[in-house]
Design a protein with these regions (language model features):
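Conserved catalytic core of nucleotide-sugar-dependent glycosyltransferases
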Residues: 178-274, 281-283
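Short, acidic, metal-binding catalytic loop of nucleotide-sugar glycosyltransferases
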Residues: 90-100
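Phosphate/oxyanion-binding active-site loops and adjacent basic polyanion-contact surfaces
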Residues: 80-84, 148-156, 288-292
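N-proximal low-complexity "stem/linker" segments adjacent to membrane-targeting elements
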Residues: 10-90
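Active-site-proximal specificity loops/subdomain of glycosyltransferases
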Residues: 123-166
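A conserved acidic beta->alpha catalytic loop
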Residues: 80-81, 106-117, 135-137, 175-177
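C-terminal catalytic/acceptor-binding lobe
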Residues: 14, 19-37, 250-315
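Short beta-strand-to-loop acidic/aromatic patch adjacent to the donor-nucleotide binding site
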Residues: 166-180
Length: 315
């Protein structure tokens, strides 16, 4: 977006924010065109007036801190070429926020142009590395805990090995997010890590547009609605897997406003999380549950959900 928004009935601030999903860049994509992010409701992007002044101050503090930081970005990519086009362009932009930024991506078994895009991108950027493998594994997209999470834990452990000695922070990002992430949210998350010395991780609110039943007292109507996506990794005040127990679907409806206070949690991810490098190295991924949950159980330090960190997964 990169623009100043007009006030809407006095509820939303006119804070200028950076947009999600920057345009695709020709040097990465060739003729491949990335996704065009649909218009998001303003309340999902901009802070309410009550949070606006503090939000602006915290972003600037985060940017100032980031300018002295070495951030290492890691992530997974498989069969996500169009999302990858936008997200790699976003990495080029994000890199300007930091004193230094490096990048490593683990890929396996892609059948689209993902491998080609990664190879082209890393060949012209010495600060970026990729590890592409053909393991002959099927894509287990709809599975919960099981072989899928065992394999994801394996790939994420490989990402841990890529962290350079000089890194201060590690940003874990899922490169298949079709709508990308908010750079302002990253700055806001860095503010929290700089301000709270016991904080080991800040996680995002991820969004997806889905058909949702709405009840008006007499009839049920199915409507398109933006909801909170990563409910399984989100464990609020215990490690109990309420989602697979049939008690956690309410979390899809919980989207705390941008600029609102950080929420202490046992676990959260949301497509992007920022870790202190030492804490990230110390954690251990396993696959008996959501791999992020198992990792966070071994993490030294506190974990917060940051309502100002936004990732758009799909629509």
């Amino acid at each position: 977006m990169g623009r100043t928004r007009r006030r809407n009935s006095g509820t939303l601030s006119n804070v200028t924010t950076d947009g999600l999903a920057p345009p695709a860049i020709e040097s990465v994509s060739g003729e491949l065109v990335g996704y065009s992010l649909p218009e998001l409701p303003a309340h999902l992007v901009y802070p309410l007036d009550v949070f606006a002044d503090a939000f602006t101050r915290e972003i600037e503090r985060g940017r100032k801190a980031a300018s002295h930081i070495h951030a290492h970005v890691v992530g997974l990519a498989r069969d996500c070429d169009r999302a990858l086009v936008n997200n790699l362009a976003a990495m080029d932009s994000l890199r300007t926020m930091f004193g230094e930024m490096t990048l490593h991506i683990e890929e396996n078994d892609s059948r689209d142009r993902t491998k080609e895009i990664l190879a082209d991108y890393s060949s012209s950027r010495p600060w970026a590395t990729v590890n592409c493998k053909d393991l002959g594994r099927i894509h287990r997209g709809s599975e919960f805990a099981g072989q899928r999470t065992v394999e994801l834990a394996e790939y994420r452990t490989a990402c841990q090995a890529s962290v350079p000695d000089g890194a201060d922070l590690v940003i874990v990002f899922d490169f298949d997010a079709k709508g990308g992430f908010s750079p302002v949210g990253v700055a806001h998350g860095i503010h929290l890590l700089a301000a709270e010395r016991h904080c080991a991780c800040v996680a995002s609110v991820s969004l997806i547009r889905s058909r949702v039943a709405q009840w008006d007292g007499t009839t049920t109507t199915m409507l398109d609605q933006w909801i909170h996506y990563d409910a399984w990794a989100l464990r609020l005040n215990s490690w109990f897997d309420d989602y697979r127990a049939g008690m956690g679907s309410w979390k899809h409806q919980w989207i705390p406003p941008v600029g609102s206070p950080f929420v202490p949690v046992c676990s959260a991810f949301g497509g992007m999380a920022i870790y202190r490098a030492g804490a990230y190295r110390a954690g251990r991924y396993t696959g008996e549950d959501c791999e992020h949950v198992k990792f966070h159980q071994t993490l030294p330090g506190r974990i917060y959900l940051n309502p100002s960190m936004r990732v758009v997964m799909d629509w």
